[in-house]
Amino acid sequence: LLSHYHAVRVLGASAYGAEHIIASEDTRDLIVERGQFDKDSEIGRFPRLFQNVESVPDGLTWPTMTFNKKMTLWLGKLEVQILQLGRGHTKGDTVAWLPQEKILFSGDLVEFDATPYAGDAYFKDWPQTLDNLAALKPEKLVPGRGAALQTPEQVQAGLAGTRAFISDVYESVKASAAQGEDLRKVYEATFA
């Protein structure tokens, strides 16, 4: 399952040799539109990590199956819901929800003890998407980065921490832009 189109997800997935690779239609569209650029950018920014980039099979990992909004899989008796609950980190954000176990795999919509990457973010939508995740009432959550959240209290802390960062950045940028500040001043005010 590709949680979104970023190279950190799409480059390494081929190493698993999976028969099927699932992505949302939005994620597939973003791989088509930006995947190669994102791959080249990652390689350029982190050459130490890509010393043997030619060893990555097939470069980008392409989905073999796509879905729109929801797909349900059964792994024996285990129900796995693959959901798009809104935009946030990217347009194609996808989560995996195990309703019987109340475990949520959030992709990069939630990051714990890590700063969320927001280069492709939908700041206005992300808080509502976090509300949509919370509405599932997960008791455990595996974030895109950071330790697994093992209790409902930790899950709430992870959601709240991500929300606080996104909201703080958005409100700071919005206030600076309303004052007509140039980009450098907006950056300085936001990350001061």
Roles of regions detected by a PLM:
Residues 58-128, 135:
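Catalytic core of the metallo-beta-lactamase
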Residues 1-6, 22-26, 85, 104-107, ...:
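Active-site neighborhood of phospho(di)ester-bond hydrolases with catalytic His/Asp-centered motifs
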